[in-house]
From Swiss-Prot:
It comes from Shigella boydii serotype 18 (strain CDC 3083-94 / BS512). It comes from the Bacteria. The active site is at K21, T24, E74. This is N(4)-acetylcytidine amidohydrolase. Belongs to the N(4)-acetylcytidine amidohydrolase family. Keywords: Hydrolase. It holds the Pfam family ASCH.
Length: 103
């Protein structure tokens, strides 16, 4: 069995599969992904594989520069997005946006 390259919380699986979530915002530990990378995707909770994605773009962002567009790409409101990112990465301000599409 191949290992997964990236994981998402299970609550995001349906949005990813339906194309409603098209970016992920990560910290420096996952800043190495590049445009064109093809990644196996698993659930964070059990590492179960659920799809393959292709990275279509990467960029950097801070909590202060998150926009409504980022929130739309995450399928949530900007307020929700800022809270989710702050909860997952407490005390951090610099992040890496990974845009993707399901294959």
């Amino acid at each position: 069995m191949q290992p997964n390259d990236i994981t998402f919380f299970q609550r995001f699986q349906d949005d990813i599969m339906a194309g409603r979530k098209t970016i992920t915002i990560r910290d420096e530990s996952e800043s190495h992904f590049k445009t064109g990378d093809v990644l196996r995707v698993g659930r964070f909770e059990d590492d179960g594989y659920f799809c393959t994605i292709e990275v279509t773009a990467t960029s950097t962002v801070t909590l202060d520069t998150l926009t409504e567009k980022h929130a739309e790409q995450e399928n949530m409101t900007l307020t929700e997005l800022i809270k989710v990112i702050a909860d997952i990465y407490p005390g951090q301000t610099q992040f890496y946006v990974i845009e993707f599409k399901c294959l």
